[in-house]
Design a protein with these regions (language model features):
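Catalytic alpha/beta core of large soluble enzyme barrels
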Residues: 19, 23, 32, 40, ...
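Extended, well-ordered alpha-helical scaffold/bundle regions in very large, multi-domain proteins
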Residues: 1-45
Length: 187
């Protein structure tokens, strides 16, 4: 629901701006100019584990874009947010936190950062190293990608301590890579 709303209202705002100020010069080169939205081109394997119906009126939005264009040629990409998370005291974008407290080093020094609203949300956080596999994470990224018009910076993580000789098997790496492809992850 969240990513549907984000993309929908960004497109709606960009189309309104195009109505006021004209479409961006590259609009004609976009998929949007051809009437193609991210919801039209996502990998349908997503529907096997997320059958959520669209909640917003995409047909009306498609017509609005057809009539007025877009002020922006692209609108969404998800990045790691490593630096900005320090400024805003947020987690690293869509990545699960490594721990409740993390230590981040930069040219300005060392920063100890506690996850937002630790006392209230402590039991709601899923920590990176407690996730048994990347499957659920890749499913979530695939669901997000259904609405994002660029790519998502997504990382798969492996705790070497869980594997023989502390070596992550190539078979597992390939499985996760193919799973990401299957779900339409564009990173």
């Amino acid at each position: 629901r969240t990513f549907e709303a984000v993309q929908y209202y960004l497109l709606q705002a960009s189309s309104r701006l195009a109505q006021e100020q004209g479409a961006c010069p590259a609009y004609g080169d976009t998929f949007y100019a051809q009437g193609i939205m991210p919801i039209d081109s996502y990998k349908k394997d997503i529907n096997k584990f997320c059958a959520q119906e669209l909640l917003l009126d995409w047909d009306a939005l498609r017509q609005q874009i057809k009539d007025h264009g877009l002020r922006n040629s692209t609108l969404t990409a998800l990045m790691p947010c490593e630096t900005s998370s320090q400024i805003t005291n947020s987690t690293n974008g869509i990545e699960p936190p490594r721990g409740y407290v993390s230590v981040k080093a930069s040219k300005d020094g060392i920063l100890k950062q506690v996850v937002p609203e630790f006392k209230r949300l402590r039991n709601s956080y899923e920590l990176l190293w407690s996730i048994p596999s990347n499957e659920g994470y890749l499913q979530l990224v695939g669901i997000m990608q259904k609405f994002v018009d660029q790519s998502i910076s997504a990382n798969t993580n492996y705790d070497p301590a869980r594997f023989d000789n502390e070596k992550v098997p190539m078979k597992l790496l390939l499985k996760d890579l193919l799973t990401a492809y299957k779900y339409g992850v564009k990173t």
